[in-house]
Amino acid sequence: MAEFPASLLILNGKSTDNLPLREAIMLLREEGMTIHVRVTWEKGDAARFVEEARKLGVATVIAGGGDGTINEVCTALIQCEGDDIPALGILPLGTANDFATSVGIPEALDKALKLAIAGNAIAIDMAQVNKQTCFINMATGGFGTRITTETPEKLKAALGGVSYIIHGLMRMDTLQPDRCEIRGENFHWQGDALVIGIGNGRQAGGGQQLCPNALINDGLLQLRIFTGDEILPALVSTLKSDEDNPNIIEGASSWFDIQAPHEITFNLDGEPLSGQNFHIEILPAALRCRLPPDCPLLR
């Protein structure tokens, strides 16, 4: 078997009792691969483990968890300075795994782990909000954000991505559009938005394709706005067809500015960020990620 450089797996604490994962790691270790494992307990652990990975000289830091875990590891990696910054590997263990699914990471743990260690490392973009918070997948605002933020953890654990839809239907009568103004390169829109998706990746909320044209290495963010005065009629309309749909506004830009007369909340890879003013910009080729050769999000 070919020799591979060492890797460090940063595992979300919720996945420590995953027996198939433990078996997959032990099997690869028996085949000669060096895999260090660290478990997160609280916010900030991922950044500390990335620093440890640099000292160990590993070639890959593997994010084992959902979109939030991937986000924490990515954010720590892009803050590293100097040469020999480890590549990102992805092991999908979360509720929705939107980013991992959209880039084609295998669901089988052993295959995903092998890809994370031995896959080709490709430079991909990230995005940054207000010069501080980053996301690798998507920023969502409006109806979708409130649903994903408020869906109970027990419901998510039991039903996965379907839980967001069920909780959304339960809350349909209490949700209202967000009034805002959005500017970008050759783009300007203002009005009432039911859902706002600004994507480096394509899907969020457990498999919803909010930005179906997004690519992760094109230096652009894809914007999709779902409009309408009432939630249910507009939602039904958007589900029918994307072609010539008056309730869908689209744009592409390396940056977007969003202003609102009231506080709105964006969900950045699962983490909420509230405010009235947002500047979202792309960070081209911000890190290297081990991806399958047929990844659909590469140009």
UniProtKB/Swiss-Prot annotation:
UniProt-annotated binding residues for ATP: 40, 66-72, 95
Enzyme class, first EC level, given as a word: transferase
S-S bonds: none
Gene3D superfamilies: 2.60.200.40, Probable inorganic polyphosphate/atp-NAD kinase, domain 1 (3.40.50.10330)
Stretches assigned to the DAGKc domain: 2-133
PROSITE patterns (alphabetical): DAGK
GO biological process: phospholipid biosynthetic process
Active site positions: 271
Main localization of the protein described in the UniProt heading: cytoplasm
One function term, GO molecular function aspect: ATP binding
Cofactor dependence: Mg(2+); Ca(2+)
Segments crossing the lipid bilayer: none
A GO CC term assigned to this protein in UniProt: cytoplasm
Protein EC: 2.7.1.-
Compartments where found: Cytoplasm
Binding-site positions, Mg(2+): 215, 218, 220
Co-factor binding details: Binds 1 Mg(2+) ion per subunit. Ca(2+) may be able to substitute.
Keywords, sorted A to Z: ATP-binding, Cytoplasm, Kinase, Lipid biosynthesis, Lipid metabolism, Magnesium, Metal-binding, Nucleotide-binding, Phospholipid biosynthesis, Phospholipid metabolism, Transferase
Family to which the UniProt record says this protein belongs: Belongs to the diacylglycerol/lipid kinase family. YegS lipid kinase subfamily.
Function according to Swiss-Prot or TrEMBL: Probably phosphorylates lipids; the in vivo substrate is unknown.
HAMAP family: YegS
Annotated protein name in UniProt: Probable lipid kinase YegS
Organism: Shigella flexneri
